[in-house]
Curated annotation (Swiss-Prot):
Superkingdom of this protein's organism: Viruses
SUPFAM superfamilies noted in UniProt: all-alpha NTP pyrophosphatases
Gene giving rise to this polypeptide: 37
Source organism of this protein record: Mycobacterium phage L5 (Mycobacteriophage L5)
A Pfam family the protein falls into: MazG
Gene3D superfamilies: MazG-like
Listed InterPro entries: MazG-like_dom (IPR004518), MazG-related_GP37 (IPR011379)
Name under which the protein is recorded: Gene 37 protein
Phylogenetic lineage: Viruses, Duplodnaviria, Heunggongvirae, Uroviricota, Caudoviricetes
Length: 114
């Protein structure tokens, strides 16, 4: 599925304060907090694999993480909507940035403006 098609389809299920209003700090805040929450759920599941399963990843773990990754993707799509940008634009811009860093030999290191 193309990311922009996903973004459109996911927006049909977007029911939250400020949904669809690109000027709404309420909407932007809501989806940002949701994204962080879902990413935290992934981190927590991975932590428990390390703690409780000696780092052995089962198919059940993979399925659970895939479900959480879907939730992350939903919030990423809504964040893009709140910023009035297509996911394809975001992903292409990111790849361009990373390729530039690789070409210049600065892909490792730190800082946004390398």
């Amino acid at each position: 599925m193309h990311v922009d098609i996903y973004q459109i389809a996911a927006s049909d299920t977007a029911i939250y304060p400020g949904a669809g209003d690109c000027d709404s700090i309420e909407g932007l805040s809501y989806v940002t907090m949701g994204l962080v929450g879902e990413a935290g759920e992934i981190a927590n599941k991975v932590k428990k694999i390390l703690r409780d399963k000696d780092g052995v990843i089962t198919q059940e773990n993979r399925d659970d993480l895939q479900a959480e990754l879907g939730d992350v993707m939903w919030y990423v799509a809504q964040l893009a909507n709140q910023l009035d940008v297509w996911l394809s634009t975001v992903t292409q811009r990111n790849l361009n940035k990373l390729q530039s860093r690789k070409d210049r030999g600065v892909i490792q290191g730190s800082g946004d403006n390398r």
